[in-house]
Amino acid sequence: MNEVVQTPAIQPLPKSAPTAGKQNLLDLDRAGLEKFFVEVLGEKKFRAHQVMKWIHHRYVTEFDEMTDLGKVLRAKLQEHAEVLVPNIVFDKPSADGTHKWLLAMGVDGKNAIETVYIPDKTRGTLCVSSQVGCGLNCTFCSTATQGFNRNLTTAEIIGQVWIAARHLGNVPHQMRRLTNVVMMGMGEPLMNFDNVVRAMSVMRDDLGYGLANKRVTLSTSGLVPQIDRLSTESDVSLAVSLHAPNDALRETLVPLNKKYPIAELMASCARYLRANKRRESVTFEYTLMKGINDKPEHARELARLMRQFDNAVQAKDSGKVNLIPFNPFPGTRYERSEEAHIRAFQKILLDSNVLTMVRRTRGDDIDAACGQLKGQVMDRTRRQAEFNKTLQAGKGSDAAA
């Protein structure tokens, strides 16, 4: 008979105020946690494994609640360590099951990132952020309008998975609700390489979230040297934000293309696949914008690019295309392609034997396009703060939050 594991009752999240001299255990993968237990606590490695399970399987952050640890070890942990997760600023479910969290990074409340859970019939995908803002300035991206602040720590990245899994009641050995993680949220993951790779290690560890390599996907705008480094240090699925079939157009949409043009980018993707035979394909993301990159000639050019990629890898279907209807946000000059143009674009690719999917928009009612909720909530927070200052200064009450 299978053991029945009770989902822990949802308790209020602890404050994310770090304590000087204490190690946040969420910042460590298995190897780092083992080293901490041996070198700092003077304990055996298996004790690190016990604590890792308490944190990631049972969502326990208080050492006193880790009941299979002795009092002496718990006292050591209280002295030298802590488990801090991000604070939830805003928790917004959608009518279609999509769920979005706005999470505060740090104790000052000035930085926030977004995490989105997208359920489907056979899987549940979590979209995770890697930076506060982004510095690549892609012209069609809402996050780019907010600028770049800083990289997220490993704890802040894996903390997003912890919060979502805790919310979903994702207890190991029961029905899995969180089946995939995509590093497609705010930021460029490869510009925060070490922290992202460490967090993805926890996602794929059986003591963490036990996801298969192919179920963790890193999406990049095309940092060629980091793609090459990733091929030797991690074994996750790779997605590339392409969005244009030629350099002239891509440079206007993704300025990084001026440094790493399409030919160099495609060559690095081919090297990524050839480095490990278990890697079957790279997904190329293509956001369709009305009158910009959705014309038939763009589709034919993209089909040629995919055929060239197959030849470089020497394997059929090495490149898959994911067509993404543009999700408008306030102030953008771009528009979503019409449905007829999207279908015509896809047909040209399919007729050219290119594996092509159209990503259906989810969570429109909660602004699930990355960067939108942060902009709305943080703007309201700013206006509320200004309103409060006005009242405190006795300047009247004609301001509005």
Swiss-Prot record:
Active-site residues, record numbering mapped to chain: 114 (proton acceptor), 370 (s-methylcysteine intermediate)
Subcellular location: Cytoplasm
Keyword Metal-binding among UniProt keywords: yes
InterPro entries from the UniProt entry: Aldolase_TIM (IPR013785), Methyltransferase_A (IPR040072), RlmN_N (IPR048641), RNA_MTrfase_RlmN (IPR027492), rRNA_lsu_MTrfase_RlmN/Cfr (IPR004383), rSAM (IPR007197)
Gene3D superfamilies, per database record: 1.10.150.530, Aldolase class I
Domain of life: Bacteria
Uppermost EC category: transferase
GO BP annotations, alphabetical order: rRNA base methylation; tRNA methylation
Disulphide-bridged cysteine pairs: 127-370
Cofactor: [4Fe-4S] cluster
Catalytic activity: adenosine(2503) in 23S rRNA + 2 reduced [2Fe-2S]-[ferredoxin] + 2 S-adenosyl-L-methionine = 2-methyladenosine(2503) in 23S rRNA + 5'-deoxyadenosine + L-methionine + 2 oxidized [2Fe-2S]-[ferredoxin] + S-adenosyl-L-homocysteine; adenosine(37) in tRNA + 2 reduced [2Fe-2S]-[ferredoxin] + 2 S-adenosyl-L-methionine = 2-methyladenosine(37) in tRNA + 5'-deoxyadenosine + L-methionine + 2 oxidized [2Fe-2S]-[ferredoxin] + S-adenosyl-L-homocysteine
Function (record text): Specifically methylates position 2 of adenine 2503 in 23S rRNA and position 2 of adenine 37 in tRNAs. m2A2503 modification seems to play a crucial role in the proofreading step occurring at the peptidyl transferase center and thus would serve to optimize ribosomal fidelity.
Note from the entry: Reaction proceeds by a ping-pong mechanism involving intermediate methylation of a conserved cysteine residue.
Family stated for the protein in its record: Belongs to the radical SAM superfamily. RlmN family.
Protein name, UniProt field: Dual-specificity RNA methyltransferase RlmN
Native source organism of the sequence: Stenotrophomonas maltophilia (strain R551-3)
Name of the gene this protein is made from: rlmN
